[in-house]
Amino acid sequence: MEPTLDEMSKSVAGLQITAPRQEKAIQARIDALKQFGNHIQELSLLKNSLLETYEAQSFNVSSFCEKVMEQVKEDIHPDVEVTTDIPKIEIKTNAEQLQRILLHLLRNAAIYTTSGKIKLEFKKKGAHICQFIVTDSGPGIPVEKQMAIFKPFTEIKDLTDGDGLGLPICSLIASKMNGTLSIDPEYKKGSRFILVLQV
């Protein structure tokens, strides 16, 4: 019987005293494999339940976004200016899933932006259509790679640097919220992601 990742993790703990550096590296890879497995499972569940929409609740979008920004402020480089443009209005959608998407977009922005700006804004585009926009002044994503970032398994990479499944998962969550997640191909000063929702 082959050992599970949890059993391997416990075994690795024994290296802490004799080889602390190796212990950290091995543990990081085990943790990355666990997350990769969880993400694959979630992708499968999302793909098989796209017709099942999430329950919606009414909430104040300004207060909601303040709480989201509070959760990511520790991840943002001190040289980065953070701004928001959120009106004090009520919307109706699934707050938990919206938070997941925004947190992922903002944390990605924090990783790649070490100076300049990160901005979160909200725009009403009609009676029941709105946009959440996350903009950063990081290096941006080459145009030829922009379509691929929402598709799983488009590149092989070191899992300790992330498995590349976060955006595909967010895109599927957006679909289940009767919305879409896209990148603005016209924006050239970094990256701009646009989440469109029916609210």
Regions found by a protein language model. Give the residues of each.
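Conserved micro-motifs of the catalytic ATP-binding
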Residues: 48-54, 90-93
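Short helix-loop "hinge" at the ATP-lid/N-box region of the Bergerat-fold HATPase_c
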Residues: 109-110
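Short beta-strand/loop element within the Bergerat-fold HATPase_c
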Residues: 117-128
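Acidic ATP/Mg2+-coordinating residue in the GHKL
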Residues: 136
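Short conserved segment of the HATPase_c
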Residues: 141-153
